[in-house]
A protein has these predicted regions:
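Alpha/beta-hydrolase fold catalytic core
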Residues: 1-27, 48-51, 85, 90, ...
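Flexible "cap/lid" loop of the alpha/beta hydrolase fold
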Residues: 105-110, 114-153
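Catalytic active-site module of serine/aspartate enzymes centered on a nucleophile-bearing elbow/loop
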Residues: 240-269
Length: 269
């Protein structure tokens, strides 16, 4: 099933709902600058195991509305809450990749984890993508600023270059094209605005508010959200488990899709 959920008067969020009668529900939040399509290789398999898989395009991306305006973590987490309320989701698993992981953490803190029974973080862009005083683990802020400038001046080239950074394993040219076209669905202004958000915002104060079992999966070759970020998350979130993905970069949802699906299913039960 596919439908739109209104989160503001002129802003609709696209939802893909696979196996609505599944015994347990997983709400997937995609990373920057992708869409729900990033989870294609989860949606191929997890419904066979009895799970309901809901993919949500964040505002500005995929098939959702692309308004001018705020793309901060609070606004994006509030969109998630409206989707949860509209679909009347309870006792569901929240799964976020990259920036979607950061939004998931903000949702847990800002909305007290409403409805969430377990949390899965995949290559999460948290607690901070960029380096800060007393936090040397991220990338330099200037690196993200260059991405923003490229987004606003030659977005297609930026996305081609991003694909090279995104994956550790070899990708066929058709798959690279799929990644490229998926990213191009976003608006240039939302692509840049979200990059500003993960450059400037941090989630250190949110981590202690995560009160549910949490599975952290992260590629050890990740060049975008470096692996030490996952180690900080593991140290800071109570009742969390870290599983390194030894043959993945940032694209672990594809690069080690079988392992990811297996670990996620075991975690959910």
């Amino acid at each position: 099933m596919e439908y739109l959920i209104k989160v503001e008067p002129d802003v609709d969020i696209f939802i893909q709902d696979v196996n609505p009668s599944g015994r347990k529900t997983i709400l997937f939040l995609h990373g920057w600058p992708l869409s729900h399509r990033a989870y294609e290789y989860q949606f191929n398999q997890l419904p066979k195991m009895g799970y309901r898989c809901i993919g949500m395009d964040m505002r500005g991306f995929g098939n959702s509305s692309k308004p001018w305006g705020a793309y901060n973590y609070d606004r994006l987490a509030d969109d998630v809450r409206i989707v949860v309320d509209t679909l009347q989701l309870r006792d569901f698993i929240l799964c976020g990749h990259s920036m979607g992981g950061a939004i998931s953490i903000r949702y847990m803190a800002r909305h007290n984890g409403y409805g969430v029974s377990k949390l899965a973080l995949l290559g999460a862009a948290a607690p901070s993508v960029t380096q800060r005083p007393d936090y040397p683990y991220g990338v330099p802020k200037e690196d993200v600023t260059k991405l923003i400038q490229a987004s606003l001046n030659d977005r297609p080239k930026m996305l081609r270059d991003l694909c090279d950074m995104f994956f550790f394993q070899y990708l066929t040219m058709p798959l690279q094209d799929w990644f490229f076209q998926t990213c191009l669905q976003a608006a240039s202004w939302s692509t840049a605005a979200c990059a500003m958000t993960f450059r400037d915002e941090a989630l250190f104060s949110d981590l202690g508010k995560v009160q549910v079992p949490t599975l952290i999966m992260h590629g050890i070759h990740d060049k975008i959200c470096l692996f030490p970020l996952a180690q900080v998350l593991n140290q800071s979130i109570r009742n969390s488990t870290l599983i390194p993905f030894e043959y993945s970069g940032h694209g672990l949802f594809y690069e080690e899709r079988d392992k990811l699906n297996k670990e996620l299913a075991q975690f959910i039960g």
